[in-house]
Amino acid sequence: ETGRAASAEKELTMEMAPPIFQLGFKADPAPAGEEHLREQLMGELACEALLGSSSPLYAKLYSEGLINKNFGYGFELYPGCALMAAGGESRDPKAVRDAVLAEGERLAREGIDEGLFRRLKKGVYGAKVRGLNSFENVCIELAQAHFAGVEYLTFPGVSVAISKAHAE
């Protein structure tokens, strides 16, 4: 698969109120092994910094009524494939897209606020630990990690070593 998206934009018009949108951003796939797990954790942190409910962008879009409680986002990393996706309902999906792109550029230029990064890192780590309470989640994570050539349960040590610079 090429490093570029097949098309920059695809729009389908249907009678729906409110409109539903999905944004996708292709990322470089990670190599197998511990680097795969590190990239997964860094991608999740970067996604939270950009789109998470604690991020400045989320607060702005929500207060302006451009997104609602149905807004969702995530970072996925598989052997040979990586992506960030976000979607939900919006009266102006293009304004959401433009705001996400602008905030991504701002974060790349200025970096992530140190306090926000520390909170997000604790939150992502906490979510991983809480995920251990779900047998289904553990099975999925172990299987995906196996195919990526890494031991999933090493995530605590890998997580500790991730710095703000890694997520930026």
Task: Give residue spans per PLM region.
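Mature, solvent-exposed C-terminal subdomains and processed small-chain segments of exported/organellar
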Residues: 1-83, 88-168
